[in-house]
Amino acid sequence: MRSVLFLCVKNSARSQMAEGLGRVIFGDGVRVQSAGSEPSHVSPWAIQVCREIGVDLGGQSSKFVGTIDPDSVDTVIRLCAEEVCPATLSGKQHYYLPIDDPASDDPDVDPEEMRARFRRARDEIKEQLTSLAAILDRSETSA
């Protein structure tokens, strides 16, 4: 079974949404997981906006990338800039999805703006994963 690992720093928002969306988009033939270099918690905003489209992140948790067995991963998908994203798992197929971090520590960001930011990130991730699924399918059939 093919395996995809989504990476970002905190494994809180983008990579968690990508993990949940990836399970739906890639289907049962792909094992999907996520991790970060400084894991924290799954963002309640990520849980909420994914639930809006029927994707449940409830069983997911933030994980440290060092706990992932490198032999269990075929493809690494980074969702943060290379200079801050954990660089790991050499020898694997790598992709970069440039998705802006929707999270903010700014107390002036109101709940509606925060929800809009997370929805925008969710929709960008969904669109890019849909395109990537076709690429992964082609590389699987040509292998």
Residue ranges and their predicted role:
Residues 1-66:
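Conserved active-site segments centered on acidic
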Residues 10, 61, 81-83, 100-103:
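Short, flexible active-site-adjacent loop segments at beta-strand->alpha-helix junctions, enriched
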Residues 11, 50, 76-77, 125:
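Conserved small-residue
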Residues 27-29, 72, 89-93:
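Short glycine/proline-enriched coil/turn segments at helix->beta-strand junctions
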Residues 40-42, 83-86:
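Short, charged/polar "capping" segments at the starts of alpha-helices
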Residues 57-68, 73, 79-84:
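S-adenosyl-L-methionine/SAH cofactor-binding core of RNA-modifying enzymes
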Residues 78-79, 96:
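Redox-cofactor binding/interface segments in oxidoreductases and associated redox assembly factors
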Residues 84-143:
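Phosphate-binding/catalytic loops
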